[in-house]
Amino acid sequence: MADPALFEFLHTEMVAELWAQDPDPGPGGQKTSLLVLEGMGFRVGQALGERLPRETLTFREELDILKFLCKDLWVAVFHKQMDSLRTNHQGTYVLQDNSFPLLVRMASGLQYLEEAPKFLAFTCGLLRGTLSTLGVKSLVTASVAALPACKFQVVIQKL
């Protein structure tokens, strides 16, 4: 992918523009801009899922696919590997990045924790889109307890 600084700048501008266009939360308190960002990420994830794994299409298990996300996909997008992958062996995976590039530039402080979710929506869509292309239906959520670390929870939905 492109230079990390360009991607970070583009992402920051997308978030800022969508937030400026959608100042009030909709019904249920969820902003439509979060859905738009996740949709953008989903489409990018689909494209990357089609492009990246051609050499490694021997995924035998869900765990192999998640390892691919943590290593190959994360390196292609963020130029670093995911720090941790945990599972309960029942279809739930937790991916942890202790220095998530899209949150690194944010100041650490409790007031900024409220702003963090809007910077994670695109990446949730990215993960979900890549998994979708690889034939895995999933639900991806993100959480931040302390900046710049974040966790992505991937719940595999059995068909």
UniProtKB/Swiss-Prot annotation:
<keyword id="KW-0256">Endoplasmic reticulum</keyword>
<dbReference type="GO" id="GO:0005783">
    <property type="term" value="C:endoplasmic reticulum"/>
</dbReference>
<keyword id="KW-0597">Phosphoprotein</keyword>
<protein>
    <recommendedName>
        <fullName>Trafficking protein particle complex subunit 6A</fullName>
    </recommendedName>
</protein>
<dbReference type="GO" id="GO:0005801">
    <property type="term" value="C:cis-Golgi network"/>
</dbReference>
<dbReference type="GO" id="GO:0030008">
    <property type="term" value="C:TRAPP complex"/>
</dbReference>
<dbReference type="GO" id="GO:0006888">
    <property type="term" value="P:endoplasmic reticulum to Golgi vesicle-mediated transport"/>
</dbReference>
<dbReference type="Pfam" id="PF04051">
    <property type="entry name" value="TRAPP"/>
</dbReference>
<keyword id="KW-0333">Golgi apparatus</keyword>
<dbReference type="InterPro" id="IPR037992">
    <property type="entry name" value="TRAPPC6/Trs33"/>
</dbReference>
<keyword id="KW-0931">ER-Golgi transport</keyword>
<dbReference type="InterPro" id="IPR007194">
    <property type="entry name" value="TRAPP_component"/>
</dbReference>
<comment type="function">
    <text>May play a role in vesicular transport during the biogenesis of melanosomes.</text>
</comment>
<comment type="subunit">
    <text>Part of the multisubunit transport protein particle (TRAPP) complex. Heterodimer with TRAPPC3. The heterodimer TRAPPC3-TRAPPC6A interacts with TRAPPC2L. Interacts with TRAPPC2L.</text>
</comment>
<feature type="modified residue" description="Phosphoserine">
    <location>
        <position position="33"/>
    </location>
</feature>
<keyword id="KW-0813">Transport</keyword>
<comment type="similarity">
    <text>Belongs to the TRAPP small subunits family. BET3 subfamily.</text>
</comment>
<dbReference type="GO" id="GO:0005802">
    <property type="term" value="C:trans-Golgi network"/>
</dbReference>
<dbReference type="InterPro" id="IPR024096">
    <property type="entry name" value="NO_sig/Golgi_transp_ligand-bd"/>
</dbReference>
